[in-house]
């Protein structure tokens, strides 16, 4: 079993991010402060989501718990594919779980269509967000004590949809105001 601290994961993501941005800047021979700030928002979304998805929410000895990489004995115990089956009765605090899973992904629905031109419709933004959350859910199969749940996929994608609706409604309102 391998244990990873939040700081180690944060450092790894940061190094990958910086290297990627440098390579892209060198290849394109261009640098835009505005674009880098936009992409920094994407980075912040990823890091915050990694914090709450990969690491237990409660502290252990005043520290964020480590992420344990490995496999459970029976993978079937780690996967729920029945919508809303465990949502309410799995644990106390299920209301907070619903709110947190939705709220955590609202920024993705807001930031991604602003940063990525190809996400020019609500549908494309929601599909990209659903793909992102699916990757997160599948990745959790490699972590001890974590599980993959279709409820999380539904709730996270709902958060993306709410964020996307906010952005696209603002854009529609701006177009109407500019045409007056």
Question: How should each PLM-predicted stretch be described?
Answer:
Residues 1-145, 150, 164-180:
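Bulky hydrophobic segments
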């Amino acid at each position: 079993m391998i244990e990873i601290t939040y700081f180690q994961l944060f450092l790894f993501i940061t190094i990958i991010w910086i290297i990627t941005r440098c390579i892209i800047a060198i290849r394109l021979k261009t640098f835009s402060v505005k674009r880098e700030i936009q992409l920094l928002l994407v980075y912040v979304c990823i890091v915050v989501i990694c914090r709450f998805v990969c690491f237990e929410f409660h502290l252990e000895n005043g520290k964020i718990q480590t992420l344990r990489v490995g496999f459970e004995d029976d993978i079937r115990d780690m996967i729920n594919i029945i919508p809303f089956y465990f949502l309410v009765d799995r644990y106390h605090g299920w209301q907070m779980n619903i709110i947190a899973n939705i709220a955590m992904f609202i920024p993705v629905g807001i930031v991604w269509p602003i940063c990525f031109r190809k996400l020019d419709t609500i549908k494309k933004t929601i599909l990209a967000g659903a793909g992102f959350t699916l990757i997160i859910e599948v990745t959790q199969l490699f972590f001890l004590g974590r599980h993959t749940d279709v409820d999380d996929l539904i709730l996270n994608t709902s958060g993306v949809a709410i964020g996307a609706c906010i952005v696209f409604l603002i854009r529609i309102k701006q177009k109407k105001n500019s045409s007056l």
